[in-house]
Amino acid sequence: SCLSRVTMVVWNNSDTMEPIFILRGFPGLEYVHSHLSIPFCLAYLLAFIGNATVLSVIWTESSLHQPMYYFLSMLALTDLGMSLSTLPTMLAVLCLDVREIQASACYAQLFFIHTFTFLESSVLLAMAFDRFVAICHPLHYTTILTNSVIGKVGLACLLRSMGVVLPTPLLLRHYHCCHASALSHAFCLHQDVLKLSCSGARISSVYGLSVVIATLGVDSVFILLSYVLILKAVLGIASHEEQLKALNTCVSHMCVVLIFFVPVIGVSMVHRFGKHLSPIIHILMADIYLLLPPVLNPVVYSIRTKQIRLGILCKFGIR
């Protein structure tokens, strides 16, 4: 069979023979993969259209060339990258029943998936800082968040995300995979590949956990801290109407923070405490955490942000 053939390749791994992995998609539901491809294709399509529309509106409307919308552009680009990193193998497995992936391609994919995941967290932290400056230091908003500063923040977010993920595929290349070569998902994830290793993979496992704590954990703490300071500043405003107006500028960001971090926490909890759960639950949680933000983020900003909503309506000639 295809699986046994690939397992032999892995067992006989040498310097001249690259391991090949099998992407299982939804184990036990292979007979409905073609049907499952429909909602996933729709989700990808919505993500591409939504984020591309937000980017187009921000880039073409000069009135939106402000720090808040520049950071929103970064978020939309990150969401597009996250979608593109999983799309090729997801469609190959569900639509074409092509499940084989070479180790080098798998390592490249997991590099991009995890890079864009950490980049999303970094951009959300930068957006929280933007809201903090706008509400707590409104008179200095444009002098603090200049175009130069925003560019440097964006570059720092990208370099940080790439830097912490880069050792992951490099470490994986040194491990020998002697177990069955089937991966649990329709794409490659670090922990999933790590399970196949029969050599000491503790260093890579500990490093992966450390990176998650140092990025997602630290970012979430600073985002929470920024909103504590924002709330303190808002409560100091005398006018109730002005309080609501100030908080309203943060609602969209708070929504996308929850859309990102709640599934991440859910995946972590299921992975750690849900050993008895069906593998399908684990797979669905991973799919949700990678697909939900790219699909919902542009919807949230289109509904909650008047300038974006009006820009979209104008672009399509509705008003």
Over which residues does each language-model region extend?
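Transmembrane helical core of 7TM receptor-like proteins
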Residues: 1-319
